[in-house]
């Protein structure tokens, strides 16, 4: 059953991604903003599918074959591998500039790093008792400590071991040194990250900056400096501001008490967990947009030539096929609005907003929710039967 489930996950993922990309293929000669608008919902759905489809297949096996199905964690593992493998052809089609073997390597590394986190989280839920007691509290504290350690240093350490993080080239070191001196912002660590996407990250708690090699390939020194100024602006955030970003952790941490919550409160307890997890991303996005707008303003103030930062932003969005406008607010303001705020009139009209996900993304999410409700009801019935 495990092999069959994994193969089904891979085939199903490949099929729905291929079908969803048809509008994007037809727009290959259109402006990049239109191609990005059509690609974005497919990307979001594909990312959701990495955990939604394994959840659906695992819960379906538990409900249909409760005695014959493999352990649920093995089902999650097999279907997660299959879903990830089924996503590779889409990545290669959209970004053909990257050799297939390189996409495969980065996919495997990314999957291992991501699954390590989920393995700890799911194991903690499995080991949790049915009641609130000292054991459930110890498990919660242990996972929280591991999460803090992983966030501060663990994922970089793992990335180094897998060859994902490399020492920064002299070109990048000089740019960061110059911008840091001009903004009076010290940087503790600087890393070059191997990625198919052009991105940069700042970690205020560890004063760490990360730039991808793709970003260095497509941007000039002045444009890299402008992006660097934006990331350094995050390093100047007040503690209360960047600690607010950790509100996102509250999406996941309460689920460590899934078993005692459902055991005591049944379906109502499960729905409370779902509603809290659904509400927090909106709060997080609002916090993030405020801090991103602040960083945009500081980057514009630090640019040497007017328009450099806006030009760099536009090139990043175009290269990554990210939409200029989205239907729902995300963690960053719309690119079109960011360009206008930077004092530049975009060389394209304001495009239509990209959809938040695909039609099948909504269907799969709904199916997962329905299966979870049925599974919770069955679990509560079993607990009441044996107690």
Model-derived features: positions:
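Polar-ligand-bearing catalytic/cofactor-coordination segments
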Residues: 2, 12-135, 142-250, 283-365, ...
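Membrane-interfacial helix-loop-helix connectors in multipass membrane proteins
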Residues: 258-272
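Functional transmembrane alpha-helices
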Residues: 251-256
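Transmembrane alpha-helical hairpins and terminal membrane-anchor modules
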Residues: 273-284
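Short, glycine/alanine-rich hydrophobic alpha-helices that insert into or span membranes
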Residues: 367-370
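Juxtamembrane boundary at the C-terminal end of a transmembrane helix
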Residues: 372-387
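Basic helix-turn-helix/winged-helix DNA-binding cores
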Residues: 8-10
């Amino acid at each position: 059953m495990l092999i069959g489930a994994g193969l089904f996950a891979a085939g199903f993922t490949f099929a729905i991604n291929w079908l969803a990309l048809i509008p994007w293929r037809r727009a290959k000669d259109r402006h990049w903003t239109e191609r990005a608008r059509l690609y974005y919902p497919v990307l979001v759905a594909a990312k959701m599918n990495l955990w939604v489809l394994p959840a659906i297949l695992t819960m379906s096996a538990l409900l249909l074959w409760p005695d014959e199905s493999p352990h649920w964690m093995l089902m999650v593992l097999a279907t997660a591998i299959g879903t990830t493998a089924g996503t590779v052809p889409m990545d290669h089609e959209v970004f053909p500039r990257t050799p297939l073997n390189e996409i495969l390597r980065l996919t495997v590394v990314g999957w291992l790093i991501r699954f390590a986190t989920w393995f700890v989280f799911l194991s903690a839920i499995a080991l949790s008792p049915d009641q609130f007691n000292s054991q459930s509290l110890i498990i919660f504290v242990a996972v929280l400590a591991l999460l803090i350690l992983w966030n501060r240093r663990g994922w970089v350490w793992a990335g180094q071991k897998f060859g994902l993080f490399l020492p920064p080239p002299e070109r990048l070191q000089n740019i960061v040194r110059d911008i840091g001196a001009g903004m009076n912002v010290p940087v503790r660590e600087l890393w070059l990250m191997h990625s198919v996407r052009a991105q940069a990250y700042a970690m205020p708690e560890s004063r760490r900056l990360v730039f991808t090699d793709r970003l260095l390939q497509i941007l000039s020194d002045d444009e890299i400096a402008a992006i660097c100024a934006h990331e350094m602006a995050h390093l100047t955030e007040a503690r209360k501001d960047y600690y607010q970003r950790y509100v996102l952790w509250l999406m996941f941490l309460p689920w460590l008490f899934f078993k005692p919550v459902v055991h005591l409160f049944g379906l109502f307890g499960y729905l409370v967990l779902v509603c809290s997890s659904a509400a927090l991303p909106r709060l997080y996005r609002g916090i993030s947009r405020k801090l991103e707008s602040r960083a945009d303003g500081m980057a514009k103030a630090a640019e040497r030539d007017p328009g450099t930062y806006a030009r760099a932003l536009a090139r990043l969005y175009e290269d990554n096929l990210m939409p200029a406008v989205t239907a729902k607010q995300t963690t960053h303001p719309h690119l079109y609005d960011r360009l206008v705020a930077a004092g530049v009139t975009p060389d394209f009209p304001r495009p239509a907003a990209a959809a938040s996900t695909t039609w099948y993304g909504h269907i799969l999410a709904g199916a997962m929710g329905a299966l979870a409700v049925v599974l919770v009801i069955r679990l509560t019935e079993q607990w009441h039967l044996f107690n």
